């Protein structure tokens, strides 16, 4: 199947063919330009974990990127954000498996992105992306090629599950699901052990797969007789939903781990009873790592802010606004201390002057009045200085937060590989793999050298 999908000369495919080979899998929708940055993070995590497991287990371990080519939610994949702008294309028809749609649908969005590019570096990346899509027939082919432009095709396998041969392998499970409502019954028997609130669970269907119609449209098959007929005679027309897809992955791959995001962790925790019912080993679920790439200005602003990473992320608009109030309050507090000291000094001076010559009290009073006038001048200068400094600090904070949380959304969910490549270069993905600790789910912050 993989050779037919264009990886005939891949060393990773040859490794996967070895009898003792294992896999670590991740998957994602076919987002424009790979979609949000966390797609790259998931793949990098998968590669890093595969290397570590191979070293520890002394058997071949192959990282696999599972293309969500059968997904039908076009509105989630038809756009990307860059530089505060949204670039999108129209996907018609909207209810078809997106992986089989023509790559040319993405041309207008990528052409607009290229026209909006700032500087030769962005321009080169946008033009390269556009060329990849122009050289591909379908969106699935384009995303596979784009993945391989960042990750080594000799190490990584990219698998399109919308394949008749793979569906034939999965046929026994599809038949059993149609006959027994396997996923639904397993969930009903095990949901009391679900580690999340039940309202976060995906509600299982009586049959947890979509059916492709004669013209390729995707729909739920609620008629179990129809579902069973398709499972027995045309399994290639069935597409596992989110609850059955992990079973599909484990059925056709020697999977020991799955790398996913927080949302995926929820539905994976619905499935242990289904794996048990089928006699399948349950892969380890590893939550993906996170990463943020800062520009030179962003990195400098963060360093000047003096905030650690968690405190920076916790800054709310109200807290940022309070910077000026805090600075002015500090000035007031500092002056109060000095004023107390001055008051004490003047009292001593008045007592000593009175003892020496009562007329000297007049001189002390005049001196005190002059000091009061100077105090007001000093206090006004200090407040102005505090406002200016707090304004600069707030500007620095806003600058770095605009990169870390663009539009209030974590960078890895808003921006794309285009941003990371502009900041860190063409090899940012391999460098990310090398930087990750495969045994943890950490958040890395990359600053320019």
Where are each of the predicted segments found?
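N-terminal catalytic cores of NTP/NDP-binding nucleotidyl/phosphoryl-transfer enzymes
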Residues: 12, 19-54, 260
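A structural-propensity feature for long, helix-poor, extended segments
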Residues: 79-81, 293-325
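Glycine-rich phosphate/pyrophosphate-binding loops
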Residues: 36-37, 50-75, 283
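A glycine-rich helix N-cap at a beta->alpha junction
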Residues: 81-109
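Long, compositionally biased intrinsically disordered regions
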Residues: 146, 150-226, 318-322, 326-449
């Amino acid at each position: 199947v993989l050779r037919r999908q264009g990886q005939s000369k891949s060393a990773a495919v040859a490794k996967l063919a070895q009898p003792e080979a294992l896999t670590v899998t991740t998957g994602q929708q076919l987002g424009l330009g790979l979609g949000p940055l966390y797609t790259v993070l998931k793949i990098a995590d998968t590669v890093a974990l595969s290397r570590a497991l191979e070293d520890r287990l002394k058997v071949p371990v192959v990282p696999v990127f599972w293309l969500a080519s059968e997904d039908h939610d076009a509105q989630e994949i038809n756009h990307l954000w860059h530089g505060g702008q949204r670039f999108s294309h129209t996907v018609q028809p909207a209810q078809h498996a997106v992986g089989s749609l023509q790559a040319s649908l993405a041309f207008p969005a990528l052409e607009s992105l290229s026209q909006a590019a700032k500087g030769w570096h962005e321009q080169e990346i946008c033009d390269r992306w556009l060329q990849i899509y122009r050289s591909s027939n379908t969106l699935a082919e384009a995303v596979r090629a784009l993945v391989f432009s960042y990750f080594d095709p000799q190490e990584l396998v990219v698998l399109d599950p919308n394949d008749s041969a793979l569906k034939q392998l999965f046929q026994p499970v599809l038949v059993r699901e149609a006959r027994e409502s396997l996923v639904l019954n397993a969930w009903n028997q095990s949901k009391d052990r679900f580690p999340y609130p039940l309202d976060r669970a995906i509600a299982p269907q009586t049959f947890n797969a979509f059916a492709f119609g004669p013209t390729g449209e995707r729909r739920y098959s609620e008629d179990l007789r129809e579902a069973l007929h398709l499972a027995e005679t045309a399994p290639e027309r069935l597409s596992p939903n989110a609850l059955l897809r992990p079973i599909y992955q484990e059925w056709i791959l020697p999977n020991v781990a799955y790398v996913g995001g927080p949302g995926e962790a929820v539905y994976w925790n619905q499935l242990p009873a289904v794996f048990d019912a089928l006699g399948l080993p349950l892969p380890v679920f590893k939550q993906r790592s996170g990463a943020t790439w800062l520009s030179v200005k962003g990195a400098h602003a963060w360093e000047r802010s003096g905030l650690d990473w968690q405190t920076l992320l916790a800054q709310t608009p109200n807290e940022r606004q309070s910077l000026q109030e805090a600075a002015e309050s500090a000035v007031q507090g500092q002056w109060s201390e000095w004023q107390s000291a001055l008051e004490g000094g003047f009292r001593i001076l008045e007592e000593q002057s009175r003892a020496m010559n009562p007329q000297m009290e007049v001189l002390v009073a005049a001196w005190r009045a002059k000091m009061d006038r100077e105090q007001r001048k000093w206090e006004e200068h200090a407040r102005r200085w505090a406002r200016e400094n707090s304004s600069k600090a707030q500007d620095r904070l806003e600058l770095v937060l605009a990169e870390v949380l663009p539009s209030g959304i974590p960078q890895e969910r808003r921006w794309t590989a285009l941003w990371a490549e502009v900041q860190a270069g063409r090899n940012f993905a391999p460098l990310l793999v090398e930087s990750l600790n495969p045994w943890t789910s950490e958040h890395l912050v990359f600053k320019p050298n």
